[in-house]
């Protein structure tokens, strides 16, 4: 009788974590950063049909990297959660913190009990009435939650991009300044570092950009594209 194959729990969790991290690192990065009038979301994404950045509710938005079908399932579940909570209680009861907790439970359960973890990393953000009340939460494949302040980068080359943001970001940036910083940071990825040529130029039509705009009433989410985005990046918007 052969001896059953045994894998220790520690090794199993390590293998799952390595698998998820590799899947996430293959994707293009997303940058989320606060500015004077709200929160900006920027990703290098040429597709106009497959979004990495989406509205969840009035003042809450979602960004993700990794496997599209997995984070799309989470997005849809988040919209349903928000709709039910807003209808059952009050619209103001739908918060980024509550949604982040719900996602953390889902991701943690999948990572622990399923043979394959989700290859996703998420940001859930909520724009406040004042800059100091903005909330940005980062969730990883195992359900871990981090409360981020000011900015966050996730996906491929996240370390290099975060280093650029750390050097340049400060409170009170205008929207145009925040977008230009985000695009420059996205261009400062591992490929640009290896080539030694400085940040890559990323055309506006290869970007997916959205904002939570605190100056708007009720629904604060809006997408930026075309001449509006090009003008902001050129400093003329």
Swiss-Prot record:
GO terms for cellular component: cytoplasm; proteasome core complex, alpha-subunit complex. PROSITE patterns: PROTEASOME_ALPHA_2. Keywords: Cytoplasm, Proteasome. It comes from the Bacteria. GO terms for biological process: modification-dependent protein catabolic process; proteasomal protein catabolic process. Pathway: Protein degradation; proteasomal Pup-dependent pathway. It is found in: Cytoplasm. The 20S proteasome core is composed of 14 alpha and 14 beta subunits that assemble into four stacked heptameric rings, resulting in a barrel-shaped structure. The two inner rings, each composed of seven catalytic beta subunits, are sandwiched by two outer rings, each composed of seven alpha subunits. The catalytic chamber with the active sites is on the inside of the barrel. Has a gated structure, the ends of the cylinder being occluded by the N-termini of the alpha-subunits. Is capped by the proteasome-associated ATPase, ARC. Belongs to the peptidase T1A family. This is Proteasome subunit alpha.
